[in-house]
Amino acid sequence: MKQVRLHESLRALFYTPYYAALERGGHEKEGLDVILSQPSGPNRAASDLFDGYADVTWGGPMRMLQHMNQDPEPDRRLIAFAEAVARDPFVLVGNKPRLDFRFDDLRECRLATVSEVPTPWMCLQEDLRRAGIDPGEIDRVTDKSMSENADALREGKVDVIQVFEPFVQSLINEGVGHVWYAAASRGLTSYTTYYAPISYCRQERDTLLGLTRALYRTQTWLHAASSSEIAATVHKYFPELSAPVLEGAIAHYRKLAVWGRDPRLAKTGFLRLKMALISGDFIKRDTPYEECVDPSIAEAVMAER
């Protein structure tokens, strides 16, 4: 068995395709012994690959682009090769129903955004710009965790919060939260992929192919299975969640088409993410798709069927 040290950037329900691949034995079928671990923080997900703590990471292309913005040396590039989360999994949850929500409504609201990682706000501020709104005009809480923001919504301290599942499902079930805007509705936005240093990709192409085959089989299963079956498969990663909340959250993400049906990382989704990071002044360098995505891995795996 070939050992692969795999980092998850953080524990999150929208990573379900990767957890399911681990649980369904797909890696073993490829002769891979995958050891899952986490970096000391999400901001270490990319650098840990060069420091010898992991071989491959799953996480946002944002980290790849951030790394290449800071360290553009060709031999230190990070290469994405198998995407699982093709749309933005974050949701604006308000304290009252607003079925006719428009971004302009946020001018009159107190909005609490995600502080744990930068991508959710970067993508939302790009949405606002495209709607003709200056993100700086929004009354925004920026320094609280999603858990703290959920409590603030319950207590009436904010009007709307930006969160992912299972916060959305929990707030809906409690009757205190209402979906205003699901970011997945904007279309493809590349959110989570396998990536590795270019040196590892060159030396371990067979390993990348094995990881991608396991993911692709899981994606096919994921889109055919019931939400309860998926929940049972990944429950060990979320033992604190009740079955109804977990199943509801998974059903919500399936409805939103957050999870891709195959491992290709679409250029359209990559460009939408990159434009958001540039407009939000998170990165300066306009790294081309071709410099940090190798579509040949996914294409080769898909051609085997």
What function would you assign to each model-found segment?
Residues E204-K284:
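Secondary-structure end/capping motifs
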Residues Y19, M62-L65, Q125, Q169-I172, ...:
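Predominant activation on well-ordered alpha-helical scaffold segments within soluble catalytic domains
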Residues K2-I133, R140-D143, D159-E165, V176-Y181, ...:
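Short, glycine-/small- and polar/acidic-enriched structural segments
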Residues A54, W58, R154, Y253-K267, ...:
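Short amphipathic alpha-helical segments at helix boundaries and their inter-helical linkers
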Residues M275-R305:
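Conserved C-terminal helix/tail region of periplasmic/extracytoplasmic solute-binding proteins
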Residues K96, E148, A152-F238:
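Pocket-lining segment of extracytoplasmic ligand-binding domains
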Residues P39, A45, H67, M146, ...:
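Short secondary-structure boundary/hinge segments and terminal tails
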